[in-house]
Amino acid sequence: MVISAIRGGIGFLTRVPIGHDKKAWDAFRQTPVAFTVIGYPLGTIVALPFVLLSIVPVPTLIGVYLLILIGVTGITHIDGIADIGDAAVVHDTDDEHSRRRSVLHDSQVGVGGALAVTVTVVSLALGVLGATRTTPQVTFILVLTAEVGAKSAMALLVCTGDAAHDGLGAALIDESTPLSLFPVILALTPLLLAIPYLGASPTAAVVLTPLIVALVIKQWADNALGGISGDVLGAVNEVSRAAAIHAGVVVWML
């Protein structure tokens, strides 16, 4: 069951060509901990350049990181940021929930969406730039841990959220309950191994910040959209990753 869930999650969260089938997808929907588990190999892949290419100029290294991140994960989650950005600027309508939800399905990107994507990507790049002021090993662990945290933030919403409407969000959320969070928490325990390299406080910052970001976005989504959608999950992934890296760097530098 877990192996099948991980395979389904890899197909959903990445562009790795492992194939798609209903059994794996259903297993993934019923196993939120798969989000966190997948964060480990995914985080390792995107963080490797900071160790293997540490002699490369930092701007180039950050560019390589972003290219690998997009190449491995695709643009689905970034598209969620764009849709949420457009929905966030909708106001002064009789039924803001319905209007905002309709914007989520609009294929055109407005100013709000473009701004949201730009701010998120630039924030991520600047966070990684700050991380490179440490050591290659610390940067590697920060980036890896942030990826695990971002995926766990998605799992948190899946376990505790209510779906805004029928769709991808509902397909994931309807299969989980808050009790499904316990395996997610257990899956985070290997990150304790980061403490000797980052320290206890920076490690806690990188792990907890994505979860806090998820709860903040959940509150907004409940009020603005009536619940969680697939776009909200994607936005949480992107925003919490960037926030986690910034939090880790700030606490490390203190």
From Swiss-Prot:
Which catalysed reactions does the entry list for this protein?
A: alpha-ribazole + adenosylcob(III)inamide-GDP = adenosylcob(III)alamin + GMP + H(+); alpha-ribazole 5'-phosphate + adenosylcob(III)inamide-GDP = adenosylcob(III)alamin 5'-phosphate + GMP + H(+)
Gene name of the record: cobS
Single GO MF descriptor: adenosylcobinamide-GDP ribazoletransferase activity
GO biological process terms, semicolon-separated:
cobalamin biosynthetic process
Transmembrane stretches in the record are 28-48, 62-81, 109-129, 138-158, 179-199, 200-220
**EC number per UniProt:** 2.7.8.26
Instruction: Please give the coiled-coil regions recorded for this protein.
Output: none
Subcellular location, in the record's words? Cell membrane
Membrane topology, record value: Multi-pass membrane protein
From which organism does this entry originate?
Haloquadratum walsbyi (strain DSM 16790 / HBSQ001)
Q: Which UniProt keywords apply?
A: Cell membrane, Cobalamin biosynthesis, Magnesium, Membrane, Transferase, Transmembrane, Transmembrane helix
Its biological purpose is as follows: Joins adenosylcobinamide-GDP and alpha-ribazole to generate adenosylcobalamin (Ado-cobalamin). Also synthesizes adenosylcobalamin 5'-phosphate from adenosylcobinamide-GDP and alpha-ribazole 5'-phosphate.
Q: Name a GO CC annotation attached to this entry.
A: plasma membrane
Family as reported in the entry's similarity comment: Belongs to the CobS family.
Name-wise, this protein is Adenosylcobinamide-GDP ribazoletransferase
Q: Which cofactor does it need?
A: Mg(2+)
Top EC category: transferase
